[in-house]
């Protein structure tokens, strides 16, 4: 199966519906890091093939690892949804790092990086 043909068929069959995909930051749609030019090219082809919304995340919430993808999405004038990976209890006073401030600061970072939408991704 050719995923680009599949995307074209879906777009043709649902021309007025927003299509969304998940993008693993520097890993693209794979499980290893890819060079920046590969990630940019993939985003460009997916955007031009009909993808409207790209949900981007990094499993360690490292915004720099999401930036190439986010920049490529914005260059293609598509919607960028930055997903923040969340687990735990943000209101537990015993949690020294992953508290409410951590997630608010992270949300501000992805907003500054250009995210149109911020999602919380439960890692459970």
Where are these regions (language model features)?
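Alpha/beta enzyme core
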Residues: 1-18, 24, 28-124
């Amino acid at each position: 199966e050719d995923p680009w043909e599949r995307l074209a068929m879906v777009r043709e069959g649902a021309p007025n519906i927003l299509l969304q995909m998940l993008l693993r930051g520097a890993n693209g749609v794979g499980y290893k890091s890819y060079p920046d030019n590969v990630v940019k090219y993939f985003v460009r082809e997916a955007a031009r093939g009909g993808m409207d919304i790209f949900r981007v995340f990094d499993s360690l919430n490292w915004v720099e690892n999401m930036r190439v993808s986010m920049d490529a999405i914005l260059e293609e004038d598509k919607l960028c949804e930055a997903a923040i990976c969340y687990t735990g209890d943000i209101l537990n006073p015993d949690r020294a790092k992953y508290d409410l401030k951590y997630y608010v600061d992270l949300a501000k970072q992805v907003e500054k990086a250009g995210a149109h939408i911020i999602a919380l991704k439960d890692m459970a």
